[in-house]
């Protein structure tokens, strides 16, 4: 039921941004919407709800509303995998950010050298999380980039750090048949706005991200309060290490 609601929400929001989708992607999303409606009818015997109810519940599960936003400004980047550097094309704002979570007030140290992001990769259930910054401030802003062909990926969620205005990670589903399969694989890793993992290394690093977010005193705000943020950072500096 939860998976169906999530798919209903994403399909609806993606189709609201048709001008940002190519014809092939739009057809795949329409197909996803049709199959999700079929699942909803099948589930109606034990979980009766309307299509609109499914969308609303999916929005809550996804930890916020998809909003309009500008793409972060950055130079073309590449990521090194197995000794080779692959270029990455970040789409402008195919799908706007997920959630309205405020910033996480911790220092962000980009692991950035020129146009090369030295990335740490974590594998989980057919998807790969690549962490590109030495910080725990995963703002739940995710850029949806269908079919980045040069890396031969079918789907990518790009995580964006509001503290440094830079990409801090991205989650990809590799070697999948279509956009719906890619989204489903990523959903296995994303629950209510948080990335989940089962292997020990991924679990440790991602639990620290989640716990850090829960400790953020401004987590409940819809938008960051700049004055409070500056005051909080000043108090941390005055307190010392």
UniProtKB/Swiss-Prot annotation:
GO cellular component: host cell cytoplasm; host cell nucleus
Compartments reported by the entry: Host cytoplasm; Host nucleus
Principal localisation: host cell
Protein's UniProt keywords contain Disulfide bond: no
Keywords: Host cytoplasm, Host nucleus
Record bears the keyword Hydrolase: no
Described function: Suppresses the RNA silencing-based antiviral response in Drosophila cells.
Name used for this protein in its record: Non-structural protein 1
Species this chain originates from: Influenza C virus (strain C/Johannesburg/1/1966)
